[in-house]
Structure formats: structure tokens, C-alpha cells
Amino acid sequence: GFVKLLEFTQVGASLVFGDLAKSEKLGFIFAFQVLPTIIFFAALMGVLYHAGIMQQIVRGMAWAITKVMRVSGAETTSVCASVFIGQTEAPLTIRPYIAKMTQSEILTIMIGGMAHIAGGVLAAYVGMLGGGDPVQQAFYAKHLLTASIMAAPATLVIAKILAPETGEPLTRGKVRMEVEKTTVNVIDA
């Protein structure tokens, strides 16, 4: 699945950039072989968020972690969103709650952003590490995605060790995700 998406990215980059996108012809050129991957995955995440698919995935992960670890829903939602989207976009999934968060929750959000990499960058790493070999790309994709997902509960543990919860979180035990619809259609996403 993931490797097939990388192949789509390379086919699209070859269509746009021609031989510049093929490392076997002219060697490795970062701008033509890595950046299209990042752009493609950022666009894919935008479309998945527009369709509501990513919200369901993030909400499910956040619900499970909130029940097991007994932390607030807002911080868990942001940390789980960080697995798929970047450090700057993840807190936007809980924007209405940020002003009323405790210091421990805010630190958790910051650590969550730094503990994960955005999906587009993860795809770029898979492409660079795996070279052109689909088997190697699948190997690295599996391990990098697993590490990124495991970092979500680890983020919560480290954050709570550094700054234990002393206040009463507004969303303790509840997972709510209110993402404003900023796109009109899939093209806009």
C-alpha cells in the first residue's frame, strides 16, 4: 500500500520533470526526487482530512489511548494527529481547547509535535532509505510507521514524567475533535 503510493509519486514526478526525476539517469537530485513526495503526501493528507477519513483514524487512536492511559482527550488527540500531520498542524485539531489547557497538557502537545514526523517527510525518508527497491521501501515504511505510532503513547509517558498533571483538564476522559472545514472541495483540499 504505502510503497504503491510512493510509486505513484515517482510516476507523477517523472511526468512533470522527465529524466530529472529518475535517479538512474542523472543521479540523485533532492528537489526532483524527494520534494515531490512531500508535496504529494501533504496533498493526500489534505484530501483525507477533507473527506473526514483522517479524523476518524485520529479519533479512534485517541479514544484508545485516553481509555488506557487516563489522560485528557485534547492532548491525546493532538499527539495522535502528530503521527500523521506535522507539528504545526496537529494542535489545530484541538484549537478550541488550547486556551484552557493546563501546563502539563501544553507541554504534552509540544513534545508530541517534536516526537513525530509529518506523513510527507516520513514518505520521503522511505523513498531515500529504500532507494528504488520496493522491497526495501516496504521494509523501511513498516518500521518507520511503527516507530511513529509507538511514539504517541511514549510521548504521553515522557510528558507526564516531566510535568505531572496537577490541574483538572477540561477534556479528561473525553475525546472531541472539532476541525473547522476550511476547504470547499477535493481540489481546494
Enumerate the language-model features and the residues they cover.
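Short amphipathic alpha-helical coupling elements at transmembrane boundaries
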Residues: 3-7, 56-70, 82, 96-99, ...
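Long, contiguous bundles of hydrophobic transmembrane helices that form the permeation core
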Residues: 149-188
